[in-house]
A protein has these predicted regions:
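Conserved catalytic-core segment of clan PA serine endopeptidases
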Residues: 118-142, 178-294
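C-terminal cap/linker of serine protease catalytic domains
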Residues: 200-226, 232, 294-298, 374-420
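Extracellular/periplasmic catalytic domains that process cell-envelope and extracellular macromolecules
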Residues: 140-143, 157-159, 177-180, 252, ...
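Chymotrypsin/trypsin-fold serine protease catalytic domain
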Residues: 234-240, 280-352, 388-406
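N-terminal activation segment of mature serine protease catalytic domains
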Residues: 43, 50-56, 63-64, 72-155
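Catalytic histidine site
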Residues: 139-191, 337
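Cleavable N-terminal signal peptides of Sec/SRP-targeted secreted and luminal proteins
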Residues: 3-21
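Catalytic nucleophile loop of clan PA
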Residues: 157-158, 347-377
Length: 420
């Protein structure tokens, strides 16, 4: 019954998008943006961190959109300071890399002009609009398979064969690294046979394009859904969250394959001594894995304005704390935006922090639609509004400068990061 309900809602979402008309589709296109260059200058060796911080999946005292309106626009020197970054390696050593920003006109970043002022509190309340993806075909195939679980309790998303994007607060509290960051692991869902072998033959990727989510999940063949319903037991299948690579007793069910993290990179803007009021804008980090995965990853894109997103809608999947072992998908509308943040109406719970938020737009001059990551889900935050603390679900947008920085972390140079 739950699976039928999900299919109905996803079908309704698809039809609502298709009903907007072809003329409007012309606005829903990925545009090629010229990206500023971030050039590394000096590298300094730092002493090893203490790893004393406790993981904190909900932040308090955040300076959000309203609070940031009162702040001056950062200068180019400020931005270079914020975008300098720290790298922490698996052996506990760390470095600070200073950067220079080139080809970036002043005054184009961190302009916090709020839009879409309709506001309401949102974590999980009333009717829960989240969907647990229990079908093995869907949860281990793109785009759902890009969602990963961190051993620190957060979520993340695959952005290259060896890199994961997540929230900075999942590994660092702004003062020190969390206590399990030194031995941080990333869990990727895979289907294991009874012998712990390879993917079952029946679990194949779709041919000739991207598989399903809310916009296209309903297009899956009836045969696959019928088989799924027949095979599913009365109780939802549980995903084992035990440490290490699971063997033997998995019985063909999805389970996590855990991979150690080789290094963690965090912008200096996240550290409290650098940007006390604007640290939320830099709540993102990239994890480099010790070994590459074989899953399809999702590309990054500069976040467009909300009006250029179909239905002002965003999507993301993660591993919510209140649904232990389940991959949880949701889609919702954005309520308010600035150049660096947006508030959204997605139901969520601690554990989903760090998820990659994506949208689906057309490729230029093509009929093909493609999903790309445009923000990182920071989580349910208590933000300052008119001198008081109010709670909202907050996402950190991928701006041109953040795109340039994350791209540099992935490729190790800025030659491959000129357009986004």
């Amino acid at each position: 019954m739950a699976q039928i309900r999900i299919m109905f809602i996803l079908s309704f979402t698809l039809m609502s998008n298709l009903g907007k008309g072809d003329d409007l589709y012309e606005d829903y296109t990925w545009h090629v943006n010229k990206i500023p260059r971030i050039v590394t200058s000096n590298v300094f060796h730092l002493k090893s961190p203490n790893f004393d911080a406790e993981p904190k999946l909900e932040l308090n005292g955040t300076c959000g959109i309203e609070c940031q309106k009162t702040l001056p626009t950062p200068s180019l020197t400020d931005l270079e300071h914020y975008l300098s970054y720290e790298t922490m390696f698996e052996n506990g050593t760390r470095t600070l890399t200073k950067v220079n920003v080139r080809h970036w006109p002043p005054g184009h970043e961190n302009i916090t002009v709020a839009k879409h002022s309709l506001r309401r509190k949102r974590q999980v309340y009333g009717t829960d609009s989240r969907f647990s993806i229990s079908d093995k075909h869907f949860m281990t195939n793109y785009p759902f398979s890009t969602a990963v679980k961190l051993s620190s309790g957060c979520s993340g998303i695959l952005i290259s064969p060896k890199h994961v994007l997540t929230a900075a607060h999942c590994v660092h509290n702004g003062t020190d690294y969390v206590n399990n960051a030194k031995k941080l692991r990333v869990g990727i869902l895979k289907i294991r046979s009874k012998r712990g072998g390879k993917r079952r033959k029946g679990s194949k990727r779709n041919k000739g394009g991207e598989p399903e989510d809310a916009d296209s999940l309903s297009k899956g063949g009836k045969k696959q859904r019928r088989k799924s319903v027949q095979k599913r037991s009365a109780a939802e299948e549980k995903i084992s969250t035990e440490s290490g690579r699971e063997r033997g007793s998995s019985g063909g069910k999805p389970s996590f394959q855990w991979t150690r993290v080789k290094s963690i990179q965090i912008p200096k803007g996240w550290f409290k001594e650098v940007t006390e009021k604007m640290s939320i804008d830099y709540d993102y980090a990239v994890l480099e894995l010790k070994r590459p995965h074989k899953k399809k990853y999702m590309e990054l894109a500069v976040s467009p304005e909300v009006e250029k997103m179909p239905g002002s809608r965003v999507h993301f999947s993660g591993f919510d704390e209140d649904r232990l072992g389940q991959l949880v998908y949701r889609f919702c509308s954005i309520s308010e935006e600035s150049s660096d943040l947006f508030y959204q109406y997605c139901d969520a719970d601690p554990g989903s922090s760090g998820s990659g938020i994506y949208i689906r737009l057309k490729e230029p001059n093509k009929k093909k639609w493609r999903r790309k990551i445009v923000a990182i889900y920071s989580g349910h935050q208590w933000v300052e509004v008119n001198g008081e603390q109010q709670d909202y679900n907050v996402a950190v947008r991928i701006t041109p400068l953040k795109y340039a920085q994350i791209c540099l972390w992935i490729h190790g140079n800025n030659a491959d990061c000129t357009q986004g």
